[in-house]
């Protein structure tokens, strides 16, 4: 009997629901919508403080990584520049010896006949062009004669007793020195004046060490 009553109630509810849908239309049935406001999450002061600390630590790590990356980039760039500079420096030093030979030959030709001088004039122009190319790459010759001896720029090969020059003045340049920018790539080999006195074989070494 109970089963029949339940069946009857279920049938009545379905009929009532069908009747309601037919009267109002399915599209007019309203269903409750979800709330449009975000769900609030409660955070304690301690948790908030911990989150801020963690965020600060991540920021510091990021900044350190960024700084390390920039430093590494600059270091690699500097190393590449150093490698290029030293490669150029070594090439120039090897090139200077034949350049010296050409320059010395042209000096010797100045005391020869006019025919030889005319022949040497063309090579003098070539020598000038070589020096212009070196200068365009920051490589310049050092003028030493008549200047004071400097152990950072000069190599003393002989001490010359003379009263024509003050002691320490370079009286003759045997091999010209060259600089690449501010860097000395080959010191000049020079003869240096000293006062007329008893011969002291230590003068040359002392001049190189003390100046």
From Swiss-Prot:
It comes from the Bacteria. Residues 1-13 have a biased composition (Basic and acidic residues). Keywords: Chaperone, Cytoplasm, Stress response. Transmembrane segments: none annotated. It is found in: Cytoplasm. Pfam families: GrpE. GO terms for biological process: protein folding. Its main location: cytoplasm. Residues 1-38 are annotated as: Disordered. GO terms for molecular function: adenyl-nucleotide exchange factor activity; protein homodimerization activity; protein-folding chaperone binding; unfolded protein binding. One of its GO terms (cellular component) is cytoplasm. Participates actively in the response to hyperosmotic and heat shock by preventing the aggregation of stress-denatured proteins, in association with DnaK and GrpE. It is the nucleotide exchange factor for DnaK and may function as a thermosensor. Unfolded proteins bind initially to DnaJ; upon interaction with the DnaJ-bound protein, DnaK hydrolyzes its bound ATP, resulting in the formation of a stable complex. GrpE releases ADP from DnaK; ATP binding to DnaK triggers the release of the substrate protein, thus completing the reaction cycle. NCBIfam families: PRK14140.1 (NF010738). HAMAP family: GrpE. Belongs to the GrpE family. Homodimer. This is Protein GrpE. It comes from Protochlamydia amoebophila (strain UWE25).
